[in-house]
Amino acid sequence: MNYSIIFYIIGWILKLEAIFMFLPGITAVIYGETSGFAFLITIIICLALGIPLTWKKPSKKAFYTKEGFVTVALSWIVLSIMGALPFIFSGSIPNPVDAIFETVSGFTTTGASILADVEILPHCVLIWRSFTHWIGGMGVLVFILSLLPLTGGYHMNLMKAERSEEHTS
C-alpha cells in the first residue's frame, strides 16, 4: 500500500477545504459575526494538517485500486469531520454527532437536517451549510479528481473505488 500518495492527496483535500472555508469567514467579517472565529480556527487546523502532508511529493506515485478505496474512504471521513468543526466551534450545533450528521448530509446531498429552523443560524454558518451542499452537489469525486495529476496517471483506480456497485462489472 502506497501510504505516501494517500496522505499526500488527503493533505491537498484538507488544504482545499480550508480554502472553501474562507468565504464563510469573509461573510462573518462583513456581518460582524463572532462565529467567524470558528472558521478561522478550522482553517488553521486544516492547514496545519494539510501542509505537512503535502510538503514533499511522494517519490513512489503508484496508485492502484486499494489505494483508491482507502483514499475515497479517508476523504469522506476527513471532509466530514473537518467540515463539522465550524458548526461545533461556533456553537450553532454543539453536539459533535449532530454536527457531523449535518455535514455528511450536506456533502452527500441527502437533504436531511437536525436543524428545525436554519434561519436562526449566523450568516457565515448558513453559507458554510450551503457550501457543503454545493460541494456535495458538484460531487466529492469531482473535487478529488482535481488532484489526480498528483497521482501520476493512476486516477482510474480512484474512479473505480468511487463508482457504485450497479456499474461494477
Predicted feature locations:
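Membrane-proximal intracellular helices of multi-pass ion channels
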Residues: 1-169
